[in-house]
């Protein structure tokens, strides 16, 4: 198993070729991006790369394209004509690995410069896509789509999608809640060491190490289930001439008639748990012990058939015992809690985690702490690489120089940049230095203009210090309104510099 993973480089168009798009003659943007330098030794400390760039430059496509490569390899496939990736380079433990695609979309592998079979390539332990935007570009996990595992069906899926879209592609907050819950129930039967790690994530978020899901039958569904359990035929369960409330179940049985016996067995157990009421609860516990995980998987058959609904998904605060229903949480709380708990349920040492636009719905205070919270929450998982695509200067300012870097998709950059220049800096500075967005009332620009004016007033317009400040200001002029006072001041400083040079 991989103990340490570091993504180094990625090249390609990072767009999928479906049948329609392949018939349309349109330019495809090619990116060659450096994510990080190869560590000198096996890096057991996790790493963060913050990916920045303007809308439309390909941040989301970049992350999704890389995830697609590893998802394809994780399925044991050797080619995929939907991939726009031409090359990936990464470090797995102490080995340098490369993946390339040829002209007919076959994948080729190298380890330490030598050709190898794709099955010999060490891959990240897990590849996880976490997002709270309904417009993400990530591929939905095959398990969510209901596809069977082609090879090694007994092994857990390498790629996991933790986003808003359900298996039909529809965006729904309920989908992301259920996905986190499903992962937690699966993990609740893991070995003790893994359950302890997940319990620590709950604790760091301020919650007790368990989650409780409350299910509810509506009255018609409950009566239908009682009759199904009693052995009635489906056509006799509904009164003649009424709209069938069993249409979902009927469609499922058209595909697999044997499901009816499973529905009867599961419904009997669920009704027994409800004990004459319309409600029952299941619990995933990472400190104590619960056997509810297996029934949780079974009861999803009733949920998909429309015979059962999830009423609440509850976590309990440590400080006061207050219960938070995730279905009623704010969008910011939902993003943090379900995102981090969902991630906790699948992350392992040596994972590659993509996070797209984490700032969505987050209060500025949470944005300023996001990366720190991420690393502390998952500090007991080593050798992971987190790649975040963001437009937020507040998130960027939270990076730690010792284990982070910045990746800009600006055409003139696209190299891994030292985090030292961005860590802890003001939002106004980062809007200029990182995002090249001066705005109309940027305090940092005003301070730089004041410095330049003082130098000019002191007869130092010909100095290197003045020239450096002026150069950093002039490059911002194309992004400013022509008649803005700030732009006029910068042009006047240019004229002062030219006059000073003429005198010399």
Which residues does each PLM region occupy?
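Switch/communication elements of ASCE P-loop NTPase nucleotide-binding domains
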Residues: 1-76, 309-444
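A short hydrophobic beta-strand->loop->alpha-helix junction that borders the nucleotide-binding pocket
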Residues: 131-134, 163
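A structural signal for short, well-ordered beta-strand segments and their strand-loop junctions
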Residues: 128-131, 211-216, 354, 388, ...
